[in-house]
Amino acid sequence: MSVSNPPSSGKPLKLRVNKDSEGYLSLVTESGEVYKCPICGNDKFVYNYERGEAVCIVCGAVVQEQLLDLGPEWRAFTSEEKGQRARTGAPLTRLISEALTTVIDWRDKDVSGKELDIKRKLEVIRLRKWQTRARVQTSYERNFIQAAQELERLRSAMGIPRPCIEQALEIYRQALEKELVRGRSVEAMAAAALYMACRMMKMPRPLDELVRYTKASRREVARCYRLLLRELNVKVPISDPILYISRIAEQLKLSGEVVKTAIDILQKAKKAGITAGKDPAGLAAAAVYIASLMHGDNRTQKDFAVAAGVTEVTVRNRYKELAKALNIKVPVK
């Protein structure tokens, strides 16, 4: 049975998309009827990915707008080939591997927040004990779990994207396998791995900002970072100061015009060769500071220093260098 939806109908049909072996679409209504083109009666369509439209292959009529193709982009002709190309299934992440199971909460309360009675409380204590025994077996697993929990805490506190945490866990795993963690604190190694991961993913964070959220000192984290660089033979790209601009502007609620001007300033500074050997966060803070002054936003250098995680002196020095080299006439407020 088939149905066609005339162009003049008031309420559009909700259509389900099927894709055949040739790559053509067939549209099926909620009642299971095959949808046909209202112009020529054809039942095969192609999908316009740029516009999200289903187009008839015979007459070219757009039969459905804002259509979401939820199927795979690949084609398979056998069930074996389909299984090989499928990418669905449970997400495999570093955060749920290596015995990283759930934890029974230490607060003896039920789902509504009420205290458990004494009998139930003793039962939960016993279950928690066995959960801990069954969850972790080796020192390797215990160490890795501590690092994963520390990285998850840093992610929550600093708002770091999850891909950076995944990369940091991979770096920490390599350090564990090479026994680089022995004799060093988990907090320092985890922070160093996260600092490296953020730079590798081109989402850098200043080291001073990272240190504010961890128990380890700046010296410990820097030492562990140099150790990871040396022993893991990891190529970390040089941080581009432009990557810091959006975060600084977001924290200070600056306009898009200020961001664009700051990017232009740093691009000119790169061409002039005055960015080499300078702290990228300090350069970004100075560029955003200059751009904000040019657009009439007279905030203090301290505001930009705090947002970038650098000192006020650094912002002032980088400001003077940029203003002099690029001949920018903006007075210091």
Curated annotation (Swiss-Prot):
Residues given in the record as Zn(2+) binding sites: C37, C40, C56, C59
Gene Ontology BP, a term: transcription preinitiation complex assembly
Gene Ontology cellular component list: transcription preinitiation complex
InterPro entries referenced in this protein's UniProt entry, alphabetically: Cyclin-like_dom, Cyclin-like_sf, TFIIB, TFIIB_arc, TFIIB_CS, TFIIB_cyclin, Znf_TFIIB
UniProt name for this protein: Transcription initiation factor IIB
Keywords, sorted A to Z: Metal-binding, Repeat, Transcription, Transcription regulation, Zinc, Zinc-finger
Job description of the protein: Stabilizes TBP binding to an archaeal box-A promoter. Also responsible for recruiting RNA polymerase II to the pre-initiation complex (DNA-TBP-TFIIB).
Gene that encodes the chain: tfb
